[in-house]
Amino acid sequence: MSIATAVSKRINEYLFARGITLYKLAKDSGLPIATLQNLYRGQIKTPTLAVLLKICSGLNISIIEFLDCPYFSSCDLELD
């Protein structure tokens, strides 16, 4: 799985679990909606730590919580 896919899946999990939209996350994180849409679609291959931290801030979670899932612990994670 690529990093882009892992990030997209993780964002989707949080959006679904909390019943929020990308637009709400954009507002809460301070990121442009276009950036989140591109991440969600996997069009941003290697998101920066700053972007991930803003997403986490918008979700009110730590980066550790965001990355704490099988998607990111897999030895098969592809670096694009």
Feature locations, PLM:
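A short, Lys/Arg-rich alpha-helix, primarily the initiator
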Residues: 1-21
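The alpha-helix within a helix-turn-helix
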Residues: 15, 26, 56
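DNA major-groove recognition helix of helix-turn-helix
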Residues: 15, 40, 51, 67-70
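Short alpha-helical DNA-recognition segment
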Residues: 20-38
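Short, basic-rich loop-to-helix N-cap that marks the start of a DNA-contacting helix
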Residues: 43-54
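Short, charge-rich amphipathic interface segments used for partner binding and complex assembly
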Residues: 53-57, 65
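Short, charged recognition helix plus adjacent turn
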Residues: 67-80
